[in-house]
Amino acid sequence: MAPGRAVAGLLLLAAAGLGGVAEGPGLAFSEDVLSVFGANLSLSAAQLQHLLEQMGAASRVGVPEPGQLHFNQCLTAEEIFSLHGFSNATQITSSKFSVICPAVLQQLNFHPCEDRPKHKTRPSHSEVWGYGFLSVTIINLASLLGLILTPLIKKSYFPKILTFFVGLAIGTLFSNAIFQLIPEAFGFDPKVDSYVEKAVAVFGGFYLLFFFERMLKMLLKTYGQNGHTHFGNDNFGPQEKTHQPKALPAINGVTCYANPAVTEANGHIHFDNVSVVSLQDGKKEPSSCTCLKGPKLSEIGTIAWMITLCDALHNFIDGLAIGASCTLSLLQGLSTSIAILCEEFPHELGDFVILLNAGMSTRQALLFNFLSACSCYVGLAFGILVGNNFAPNIIFALAGGMFLYISLADMFPEMNDMLREKVTGRKTDFTFFMIQNAGMLTGFTAILLITLYAGEIELE
C-alpha cells in the first residue's frame, strides 16, 4: 500500500477516534468510515477485519522488541473485540468506534502481525567442506565392512540383521526423497508450504499396499516341506543361483579360490580369506595370490568391472547430493548422509560378495570397492561448487529420482528376494515381515523427525 494512503488512513482513524471528544467533525468522520466499511453505520468483526486489511495492517519488517509494547502480538478483529469487552456478535456504532480505535492505530503503526525474520544464513565454506568430507569418509568406511562381516554371513541370525538394514535403507532413501530432496528441488519450505502431511500420505500409500500384499501372501501361501513354499508362480524376485567359486589356474602346484566360502574344504585360510589347497603333497607353498596381486585381471569376470564402474557412478551422485545439501544447511546434509549411509551398508556388502564370486581375491575386492567409493569425494566437490555458485535444485531433483529408484526398484525387490530361501514356515515368514516393517518405519520416522524439527535443531 502506498505511504500516502497509509497516512491518510491513520489520520482518518485518528479523527474518528476523537469522536467522543469532538462530537462535530469526529462524529462525521466516524460515520464516513462506518458507512464505507460497515453497514447501517455499524461494524461487525468481519467488516473490521476488512478495514484493517484495507488500511494496511499487514506484515512489515521492524517489529518492536518484546517488552516495549503492552500488546506485542498480532490481534485479529475478534481479539480486539474481546479485549474491549465486546462479543463477536457486537455491532460497533459511532459511540463505540472511538473505544477500539487506539487498538486499530497500534496494529497499523507497529505491524506486530509480521513474523520476525529468521536470518537463514548458509553454513560457512569451512563448515561445508569439513562436515561434507567427514560425512563422505564415514560413508566410505562402509565399503570396508565386507572384510569384517564376511565371517558372519553363515551365521543363522545374519539374514535377519541384513533384512533390517535393507528395510532401513528403503525407509531412509524413500523418505529423504519425498520429504527433502524433491520438495527442495521445487523450492518448497516445510514450515511455509505445509507439504509434510502430503508427503506422509505418499509414504502411507506405499506402506499400506506393501502391508496388505504381504499379509495376503502369508495367509494364502501354502508352506511345503524342506522350507519350500507353493503359491502358483509366487516368486519374490528373479531366481538366482549361487555360482560355485571359480578355481583359478594352478600356480606352483597351488590352486587359489577367490570365494572365501571354500575355505571349509581342507585348505589353509590366509588373512585375505584366500584358500590355498595343495594338489601335490598337501605342503603349503608361497602363493602369488597373496597381497593385492591375486588372480590376473583378465581372469576376473566382466560382472566385477560392471559392478565397480556402476558403483563409482552411484557414489559420485551420492557425493553430489551430500555436497549440495551441505551448502544449503548442515542439517539437510546430515539427513542426506544418514539416508546414503543406511543404503551403503547392505549395498557395499552385496557388491563385495559379487566381486568375490566374480573371481577377485578378498584384498582385490576390498581395493576396487574402496576405489569406487572414493568417487564420492569427487561428487562432493562438484556438489559444493555447484551449490555455492548456482541453485542446486537440479542436483536435488536428480538425487531424489535416484533415491526413489534405488529404494523401490532395487532394494525393495532385494529385500523380498532374501526371504525365498530363508522362509521355512508361516512363523518364520511373519518374523521376517516384522523385521522389514521395523527397518522401514525406523528410517521413515528418523527422516520425518529431522524434517519436522529442522528449524529447532542447530548444528554449531
Swiss-Prot record:
GO molecular function, one term: monoatomic cation:bicarbonate symporter activity
Keywords: Cell membrane, Congenital disorder of glycosylation, Glycoprotein, Ion transport, Lysosome, Membrane, Signal, Symport, Transmembrane, Transmembrane helix, Transport, Zinc, Zinc transport
Annotated Pfam families: Zip
Tissue specificity remark: Ubiquitously expressed. Expressed in thymus, placenta, lung, liver, pancreas, salivary gland and, to a lower extent, in spleen, testis, ovary, small intestine, colon, leukocyte, heart. Highest expression is observed in pancreas. Expressed by macrophages (at protein level). Expressed by microvascular capillary endothelial cells that constitute the blood-brain barrier (at protein level).
Expression induction or repression: Up-regulated by manganese. Up-regulated by lipopolysaccharides (at protein level). Up-regulated by inflammatory cytokines like TNF. Down-regulated following phorbol ester treatment. Up-regulated by zinc and T-cell activation. (Microbial infection) Up-regulated by live and heat-killed Mycobacterium bovis bacterial cell wall.
Residues glycosylated per entry: N40, N88
Outcome of swapping C113S: Found in patients with features of Leigh syndrome; likely pathogenic; no effect on protein abundance; loss of localization to the plasma membrane; retained in the endoplasmic reticulum; loss of manganese ion transmembrane transport
Membrane-spanning intervals of the chain: 133-153, 161-181, 192-212, 366-386, 389-409, 430-450
Ranges in the topological domain labelled Extracellular: 23-132, 182-191, 387-388, 451-460
InterPro entries in alphabetical order: ZIP (IPR003689), ZIP_Transporter (IPR050799)
Membrane topology of the entry: Multi-pass membrane protein
Residue ranges that the UniProt entry lists as topological domain Cytoplasmic: 154-160, 213-365, 410-429
PTM annotation: N-glycosylated. N-glycosylation is not required for proper iron and zinc transport.
Reaction catalysed by this enzyme: Zn(2+)(out) + 2 hydrogencarbonate(out) = Zn(2+)(in) + 2 hydrogencarbonate(in); selenite(out) + Zn(2+)(out) + hydrogencarbonate(out) = selenite(in) + Zn(2+)(in) + hydrogencarbonate(in); Mn(2+)(out) + 2 hydrogencarbonate(out) = Mn(2+)(in) + 2 hydrogencarbonate(in); Fe(2+)(out) + 2 hydrogencarbonate(out) = Fe(2+)(in) + 2 hydrogencarbonate(in)
Subcellular location: Cell membrane; Lysosome membrane; Apical cell membrane; Basolateral cell membrane
Motif XEXPHE-motif in this chain: 343-348
Record function comment: Electroneutral divalent metal cation:bicarbonate symporter of the plasma membrane mediating the cellular uptake of zinc and manganese, two divalent metal cations important for development, tissue homeostasis and immunity. Transports an electroneutral complex composed of a divalent metal cation and two bicarbonate anions or alternatively a bicarbonate and a selenite anion. Thereby, it also contributes to the cellular uptake of selenium, an essential trace metal and micronutrient. Also imports cadmium a non-essential metal which is cytotoxic and carcinogenic.
Alphabetized PANTHER family for the sequence: METAL CATION SYMPORTER ZIP8, SOLUTE CARRIER FAMILY 39
Protein name: Metal cation symporter ZIP8
Gene: SLC39A8
